[in-house]
């Protein structure tokens, strides 16, 4: 029973001395007494390789490299193990979650948190922490008895003690945790003859838990010898750099005193690891109180990058230089990090440079398609077949892998489901999924082609197969009563899905293709799933449980599954965290993310028990818990020290100025400290360095091409670019080995969104030999030719969703107003409040069920929206009544359609126009309302258009002039052409072109006293004032509002009179009859010009910018045209917005059917 302690700073040869001793003993007596090297889990593989690869040893039967848990198993093999079943991490988590749910009503502080998955995880960690530090429920109960304790702390500890005690009772005599197995190991030590003959070495640790100290105590007591290696100078000062390992030494000294043995200390002072003076000086002076500056010889570098991505790209380039120029191997290099954001960057960037690497971290299995399928399947049952988990389940492609183009079929199914609002048990309604229903998907109904029918039949078959599997699963689970029943039902369901065969086939294919890591993942997924089922049966067995609770507990278990990947090769870069990674004697170590906030890292308490509660508990209960935040904060310098002393050749520190979320970052104060130790140790700004040394960017062929692209793009924009980039382009272009993909990059370099003008034949194939179109189609072309091409040429459709769109709301208002107008023959004056409500209810009952497959009755929200629509309609009718009371114009026709060949007598005829290519233009559409007034055998007509959007309820004559707003002039033209079909007199003249804004008006008041009910109603009515353009003819003016008189401005039409009875400029929007006719004829010419441009094949990405706004803001096709202000701004079209449109139209000569030149 001897105890040795090898003490010294990093790189002084402590571990080398240990390995040399072990090697000498093994050479002297290969089959002698056992030698046990205890190391952290992360180090065991590396140390085993050291013995295996030693040419003088070639392995050993005498020496074993173990961590504490594996050592315990070694002892159990000799003396016998415990009879209890050992709980896995997942089994422990599931058991504690179930206990928390059962005990929820008894909890005092955590009752509301108990339902969340994360709470049981925190509670499990706290209980495991207690066990590591030998704190029992009895300790907690004794501590809780303290009358001076705060109520919140008392309630917290009572809750934890309740769950902890219940957990201990559940596992008593039946199960054992990993921490308890270590306690059993301690009890077994005296029985082990093997241990009594063993020489023990403990290396690689900087701190231990209470249970681990007890193990060490047992080893010292029963083993032949124990040697512990610690990185410390022996200084017990709590503010020393080596506080943490010195604390370990203090504990070992206490153990030695208890056992009445002395510690044979051996101090190591000579530095052996470092190959140069830079690293020696860095190690010796890092914690020095008085700085001794020396010249840096180039073995320490500090890199500053703009972003984290740029930082890792630079590290990758420098690794290539290490391998190529310095003749290092990948296994000679290590990367250490602390910010978890870097893990993703390693995976995304290092493969681009063909750098083999292994990250010493475990990845969760939850994002694997198989796990996502299972968790989505669980959620489908839990949520009663809601659409989101169903779609996630389908998109995993696990249950649909047997279908060709399954992803495409699932995409079509998703379109249909979102359009029809399929949820809940509607998934089971075969009638809803009739193939004929797919003919209407995202478009007007049309007859399915044979190919479309075959495709949609496959969609329906796929959906039915998946539903059958889910129903089978649901039925099997619903018949289960105990946990064992549930586990059995789940496994049998997976077999029914043929999941095992599917996974094994996929694994074999991956292995055959050399993708061994992915193949290994498949194995671990299936084994992990079976392990969770086994754990459930082990822990709960025949215990009754509801299906809901079982699925919750099962999901908790799935959350704990992690991939444990074995390195695929020995020659690879080692990547790990600064806190846990065990890398030693690497030629080059890169420490990335050296920012303030990461190194040092603010340490905050994340456990259920706060730092203050820990300290109070330790004092009162005389126990030791895990270190508090302030203690851990003191050890940050030691973490940095250990990380940077792992190298023996070079150390590169790097940091970025911007975080992963775009936040500003500062340099680590440790780097400032390191920089102060050396003269001429400058921070290298990476962008500036590359600007001066462009060749440093050319380390990898593929990545050089990408950087070359950026350089050439800068050159095209007249920026100064180094000649070496032009040389690099020529080399790559002329090399058959390197020029793959170069043409693609060059085409991207000159990409400018320029479209190809369609030929005459293709234009006719796309648009037909005649143009049959609505007014909005021509307006859409004027906004942007490409928008028209995408919608009417390519016929691209947006995914239709089961939700109310703005245009749906407009259609509802139009339909409701048409229904009511026809019922009352347009006589709004006769309406009273009772009649308004009655007609509104009738109209809504008739119309709303037809909107989007009865959408407005699908949920409480939409039913509320229906009532809101009803309220808007009632207010609108009140406004129409008010307007009708003071107008001589009478509404006569509602929702009147027009086209070239009317299908009924009620429809109007639209005159055919002709393009410059001789192609007929047939305009079709629907006029919301036509009001008429007849006097002296002359009929005057008003066009009334209902708008539910305020932005579109305005007639902008500048837009009319330029063909951007064509609707109202077209409607007036159609009405003037159809006087006989409308039953008008021989002489018909325009009255007004007016918009009616259907909306829910709001009135602002400064104070409550301003509110008057009668005035409020009047003000609301005024909010519905018509806007647009009115014929300045006195007969029209008098008929529009019979109240008009001098100094009066109408509140129903845009007309006002001055004091002398003339039309006021401020309150009137009027034009004379000839001007209106000119606008109408000019509108026709805009139709001809627009249609001619369409048939000419214009498809340019050329939006029309008007009043500093682009139509792109609300365009559905941006993802297709990739409009970009930098690329396309030169093609933005503009118009002269300063013109007076009425003066402009009066100054042009127009030939028309109204009487020659005007």
Swiss-Prot record:
Organism: Staphylococcus aureus (strain NCTC 8325 / PS 47)
Keywords assigned by UniProt, alphabetized: 4Fe-4S, ATP-binding, DNA damage, DNA repair, DNA-binding, Exonuclease, Helicase, Hydrolase, Iron, Iron-sulfur, Metal-binding, Nuclease, Nucleotide-binding
Domain (UvrD-like helicase C-terminal) ranges: 269-583
Boundaries of every UvrD-like helicase ATP-binding domain copy: 1-275
NCBIfam families: addB_Gpos
Note: Despite having conserved helicase domains, this subunit does not have helicase activity.
Function: The heterodimer acts as both an ATP-dependent DNA helicase and an ATP-dependent, dual-direction single-stranded exonuclease. Recognizes the chi site generating a DNA molecule suitable for the initiation of homologous recombination. The AddB subunit has 5' -> 3' nuclease activity but not helicase activity.
Subunit annotation: Heterodimer of AddA and AddB.
SUPFAM superfamilies: P-loop containing nucleoside triphosphate hydrolases
Protein name (database record): ATP-dependent helicase/deoxyribonuclease subunit B
Disulfide links within the chain: none
Cofactor binding: number and manner: Binds 1 [4Fe-4S] cluster.
Aminoacyl-tRNA synthetase listed as a keyword: no
Pfam families linked: ADDB_N (PF21445), PDDEXK_1 (PF12705)
Residues annotated as binding [4Fe-4S] cluster: 784, 1112, 1115, 1121
CC per GO annotation: cytosol; DNA helicase complex
């Amino acid at each position: 029973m001897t105890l040795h302690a090898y003490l010294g700073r990093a790189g002084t040869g402590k571990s080398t001395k240990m390995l040399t001793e072990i090697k000498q003993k093994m050479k002297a007596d290969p089959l002698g007494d056992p030698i046990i090297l205890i190391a952290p889990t992360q180090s065991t593989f590396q140390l085993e390789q050291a013995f295996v690869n030693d040419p003088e040893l070639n392995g050993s039967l005498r020496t074993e490299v173990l961590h504490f848990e594996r050592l315990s198993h070694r002892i159990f093999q000799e003396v016998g193990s415990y009879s209890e079943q050992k709980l896995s991490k997942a089994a422990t988590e599931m058991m504690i979650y179930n206990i928390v749910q059962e005990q929820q009503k008894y909890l005092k502080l955590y009752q509301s948190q108990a339902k969340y998955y994360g709470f049981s995880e925190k509670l499990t960690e706290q209980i495991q922490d207690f066990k590591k530090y030998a704190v029992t429920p009895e300790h907690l109960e004794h501590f809780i008895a303290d009358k001076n304790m705060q109520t919140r702390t008392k309630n917290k500890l009572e809750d934890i003690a309740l769950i902890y005690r219940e957990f201990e009772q559940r596992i008593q005599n039946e199960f054992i945790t990993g921490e308890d197995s270590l306690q059993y190991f301690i009890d077994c030590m005296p029985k082990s003859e093997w241990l009594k003959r063993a020489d023990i070495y403990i290396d690689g640790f900087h701190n231990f838990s209470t249970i681990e100290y007890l193990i060490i105590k047992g080893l010292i007591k029963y083993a032949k010898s124990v040697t512990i290696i610690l990185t410390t100078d022996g200084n017990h000062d709590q503010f020393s750099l080596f506080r943490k390992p010195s604390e370990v030494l203090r504990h070992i000294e206490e153990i030695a005193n208890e056992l009445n043995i002395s510690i044979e200390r051996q101090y190591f002072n000579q530095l052996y690891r470092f190959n140069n003076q830079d690293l020696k000086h860095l190690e010796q002076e890092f914690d020095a109180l008085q700085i001794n500056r020396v010249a840096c010889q180039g073995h320490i570098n500090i890199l500053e990058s703009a972003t984290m991505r740029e930082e890792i790209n630079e590290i990758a380039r420098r690794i290539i230089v290490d391998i190529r120029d310095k003749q290092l191997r990948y296994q000679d290099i290590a990367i250490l990090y602390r910010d978890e954001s870097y893990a993703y960057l390693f995976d995304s960037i290092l493969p681009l440079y063909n750098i083999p690497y292994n990250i010493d971290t475990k990845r969760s299995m939850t994002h694997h398609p198989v796990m996502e399928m299972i968790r989505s399947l669980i959620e489908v049952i839990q949520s009663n077949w809601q659409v989101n988990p169903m779609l996630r389940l389908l998109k995993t492609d696990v249950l649909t892998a047997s279908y060709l183009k399954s992803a495409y079929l699932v995409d079509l199914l998703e379109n249909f489901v979102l359009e029809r609002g399929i949820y809940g048990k509607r998934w089971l309604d075969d009638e809803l999924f009739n193939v004929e229903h797919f003919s209407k998907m995202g478009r007007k109904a049309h007859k399915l082609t044979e190919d479309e029918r075959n495709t949609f039949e496959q969609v329906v078959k796929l959906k039915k197969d998946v539903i059958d599997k889910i129903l089978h699963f649901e039925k099997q689970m619903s018949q289960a009563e105990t946990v064992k029943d549930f586990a059995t039902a789940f496994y049998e369901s997976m077999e029914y899905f043929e999941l095992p065969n599917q996974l094994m086939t996929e694994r074999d294919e991956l292995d055959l293709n050399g993708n061994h890591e992915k193949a290994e993942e498949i194995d671990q997924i299936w084994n992990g799933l079976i392990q969770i089922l086994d754990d459930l049966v082990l822990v709960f067995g025949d215990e009754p449980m509801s299906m809901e609770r079982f699925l919750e507990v099962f999901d908790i278990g799935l959350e704990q599954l992690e991939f444990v990947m074995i390195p695929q090769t020995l020659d690879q870069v080692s990547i790990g965290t600064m806190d846990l990674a065990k890398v030693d004697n690497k030629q080059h170590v890169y420490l990335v993310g050296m920012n303030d906030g990461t190194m040092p890292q603010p340490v905050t308490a994340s456990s259920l028990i706060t730092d203050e509660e820990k300290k109070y508990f330790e004092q009162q209960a005389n126990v030791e818990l895990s270190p508090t935040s302030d203690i851990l904060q003191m050890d940050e310098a030691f973490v940095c020290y250990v990380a940077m002393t792992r190298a023996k050749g070079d150390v590169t520190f790097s940091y970025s100025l911007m975080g992963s979320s775009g936040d500003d970052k500062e340099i680590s104060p440790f780097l400032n400290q390191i920089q102060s130790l050396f003269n001429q140790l400058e921070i290298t700004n990476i962008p500036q360095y590359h600007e001066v040394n462009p060749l440093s960017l050319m380390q990898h062929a593929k990545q050089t091409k990408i950087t070359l692209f950026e350089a050439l793009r800068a050159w095209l924009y007249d920026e100064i670019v180094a000649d070496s980039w032009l040389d690099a382009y020529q080399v790559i272009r002329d090399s058959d080995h390197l020029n793959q993909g170069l043409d693609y990059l060059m085409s991207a370099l000159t990409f400018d969104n320029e479209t190809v003008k369609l030929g005459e034949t293709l234009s006719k194939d796309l648009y037909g030999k005649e143009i049959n179109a609505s007014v909005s189609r021509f307006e859409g072309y004027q906004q942007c030719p490409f928008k028209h091409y995408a919608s009417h040429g390519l016929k691209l459709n947006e995914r239709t969703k089961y939700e109310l769109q703005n245009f749906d709301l407009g259609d509802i208002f139009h339909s409701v107003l048409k229904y009511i107008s026809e019922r009352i023959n347009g006589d709004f004056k006769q309406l009273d409040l009772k009649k308004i409500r009655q007609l509104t209810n009738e109209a809504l009952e008739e119309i709303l069920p037809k909107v989007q497959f009865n959408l407005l009755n699908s949920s409480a929200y939409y039913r509320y929206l229906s009532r809101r629509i009803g309220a808007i309609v009632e207010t609108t009718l009140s406004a129409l009544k008010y307007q009708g009371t003071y107008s001589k114009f009478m509404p006569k026709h509602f929702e009147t359609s027009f086209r070239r060949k009317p299908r009924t007598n009620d429809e109007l005829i639209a005159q055919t126009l002709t393009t410059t290519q001789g192609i007929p233009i047939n305009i079709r559409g629907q006029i919301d309302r036509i009001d008429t007034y007849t006097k002296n055998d002359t009929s005057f007509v008003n066009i009334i258009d209902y708008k539910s959007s305020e932005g579109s309820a305005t007639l902008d004559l500048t837009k009319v002039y330029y063909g951007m707003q064509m609707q109202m002039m077209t409607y007036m033209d159609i009405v003037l052409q159809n006087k006989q079909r409308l039953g008008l007199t021989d002489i018909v003249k325009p009255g007004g072109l007016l918009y009616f804004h259907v909306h829910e008006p709001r009135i602002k008041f400064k104070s409550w006293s301003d509110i008057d009910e009668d005035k409020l109603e009047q003000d609301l009515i005024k909010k519905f004032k018509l806007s647009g353009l009115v014929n300045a003819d006195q007969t029209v003016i008098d008929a529009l509002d019979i109240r008009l008189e001098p100094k009066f401005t109408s509140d129903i039409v845009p007309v006002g009179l001055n004091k002398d009875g003339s039309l006021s400029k401020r309150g009137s929007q009027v034009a004379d009859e000839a001007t209106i006719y000119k606008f109408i004829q000019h509108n026709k010419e805009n139709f001809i010009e627009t249609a001619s441009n369409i048939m000419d094949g214009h498809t340019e990405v050329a939006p029309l910018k008007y009043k500093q706004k682009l139509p792109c803001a609300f365009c559905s096709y941006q993802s297709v045209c990739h409009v970009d202000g930098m690329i396309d701004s030169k093609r933005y079209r503009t118009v002269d917005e300063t013109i007076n449109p009425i003066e402009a139209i009066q100054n042009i000569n127009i030939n028309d059917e109204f009487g020659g030149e005007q």
